[in-house]
């Protein structure tokens, strides 16, 4: 009797285990179908596009005198939303949070001039390149330096958790077709990092060599600072590197990423991106 009961218990446990394994396998197989296109469905339903961007990065995105977000990235995001039949709703998370992925539905897209790099590709999906920027070396207007190669051994300022920091640390790997490999020749004496894109320029404007000798940043950002009265200039000569910028989605929704990619391609084809880069930067950076 005990032997039969024990055998029956073993059979029941074995059956329950098999059913549990079948259920788990079914959940795994069905999960992509459940979540595929989830973001696009939500945007179509709510008519709202939740956009992550920056609040202090002129002329890409910044607060104007009326405390309203304006800039190139804001115009691009609004145009994407318009073409999707939605209205853009902006949020300005910390840079590392925005580029760290695992958004948990907080945002549908990031329009923040984000470079497609190998580490970011593990947690984000790149929908498409929408413009390019050369990274340049900015110095105080009173600096006697004339060539970027003279910056070896100098104090260099960069924004933290950006491609500028990766460049000075020689760890930058850009994950985009057609972009030449980064050449590392700069050997800074000291690297100073800052939590915001404009803070390095705030130190540089204090005087030649007062806190930093140079800042590495995108050409558009440097020109924006010059236009806003910062007493700085760009060293002529070679760029630090050429950077493609991508529209970004959270990892895992291929249908949504594809839809964004189609929208970006259409904006490039009809000249919208050319017009917007010219509007904000004075030249066409869309190609």
What are these regions (language model features)?
Residues 55, 131-139, 185-186, 219, ...:
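Periplasmic-binding protein-like
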Residues 37-38, 163-186, 230, 235, ...:
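Ligand-binding clefts/hinges and TM-proximal coupling segments of bilobed small-molecule sensing domains
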Residues 90-100, 143, 183-206, 220:
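Short helix-initiation/N-cap motifs at beta->coil->alpha
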Residues 96-100, 114-122, 166-175, 202-241:
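A ligand-binding cleft/hinge motif common to bilobed small-molecule-binding domains
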Residues 37-113, 259-260, 267-270, 279:
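Extracytoplasmic small-molecule ligand-binding "clamshell" domains
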